[in-house]
Swiss-Prot record:
Post-translational modification: Highly phosphorylated.
GO cellular component terms attached to this protein's record: host cell; host cell endosome; host cell Golgi apparatus; host cell nucleus; viral capsid
Name used for this protein in its record: Minor capsid protein L2
Keyword Coiled coil annotated: no
Amino acid sequence: MARAKTVKRDSVTHIYQTCKQAGTCPPDVINKVEQTTVADNILKYGSAGVFFGGLGISTGRGTGGATGYVPLGEGPGVRVGGTPTVVRPSLVPETIGPVDILPIDTVNPVEPTASSVVPLTESTGADLLPGEVETIAEIHPVPEGPSVDTPVVTTSTGSSAVLEVAPEPIPPTRVRVSRTQYHNPSFQIITESTPAQGESSLADHVLVTSGSGGQRIGGDITDIIELEEIPSRYTFEIEEPTPPRRSSTPLPRNQSVGRRRGFSLTNRRLVQQVQVDNPLFLTQPSKLVRFAFDNPVFEEEVTNIFENDLDVFEEPPDRDFLDVRELGRPQYSTTPAGYVRVSRLGTRATIRTRSGAQIGSQVHFYRDLSSINTEDPIELQLLGQHSGDATIVHGPVESTFIDMDISENPLSESIEAYSHDLLLDETVEDFSGSQLVIGNRRSTNSYTVPRFETTRNGSYYTQDTKGYYVAYPESRNNAEIIYPTPDIPVVIIHPHDSTGDFYLHPSLHRRKRKRKYL
């Protein structure tokens, strides 16, 4: 009998890949591949509570961590009476890197006898503002020009000699001017010149004023030259008449139809004329033809077509729009009287033939609004920066100069130069026929306060905010009535009772009953 041949089992990874989708994997294959064996679970859950990272396990060093290995049963590596010894394997320590030795230098050594109290000094705060800007001016030497040989003249007369020395030639000088301008965004100036006297520039802000402009009395007479004012480019007006309006955005179809002879919206022979007084004709004319819902989004600026069934009669909201099938777009024009007219051309569907054709007349619905007037020219203002806003006033120019001789005094010849008669008022006031009016005549109101006979003095307050209220004091001699105020309760006494007994209230009497005696 032949022995069966042993077939080697396939690898666990290949078996897991083929049997995982079919779900026929053996349990040992699943546990090994997914690492769910007993050993894997011990390592997985045990590592959560115990940490062996500092012992150097599986690192190949075997140093036993920072404290080394300690023999079992001996406790820590400390012996009584001696120095503690640490058992380490004989391994060469690894060199991490060179150690840099930094020398420590004492800048200000402190002596032992010095005081330990550190004195405090006042220090100025940090200067946040920029300091003075240092300006350096470079002086370039003047280049030497061509040398000029000046002859030396010697004059000898007799025994003395005179030496004439010619002056040194002055070389030409060169001047260079540098300029720096800083931009300040918070400062705005006028970018164009002012039409009045004075001029404002962009860089230096130089104010230029003329030397004349005032009035001088008693001076020299000069010739007056007639000058012509030069208008500025901003001082002009445009006055154009408004062209007459005939219509607003007419359709080409209306223009072609209007060329036909005899056809017009106002032709009473071909088009029925209906004047509409309802204001809905301007905004929502469809509500005059049929009852419908209001749609605020829809603007009825187009032609409206209404499909009505002639078998079913519907009364329109407005009787003038009966049987209207089509209502055209609005047309704007002017009447001979100068009013604005809003017109709509409508078509009625009065008769319908057997073939389905609808026959009706054309109706011209219109409403006159107002007249068209020519607009007055409006003075427009320029946008942005422009000149003419600022006014520059120069004091000496606006003053008046009077030439007079101070040495002459016309009042010096008069004896009574400062007479008090000059202060008297010679006007005579006449009050004949005058009338004295107190208060304001336009707001004269009469108030009547009633008087009541009461035992108390009444106080009345009349509110008067328009005129004057005059109160006249009055004195009255009325006898004062004093009413008694008893402190004990009121007792009713009946003098006709002679029994001397008390008075019993009827409600306290005993009721009489009929009793039967046996």
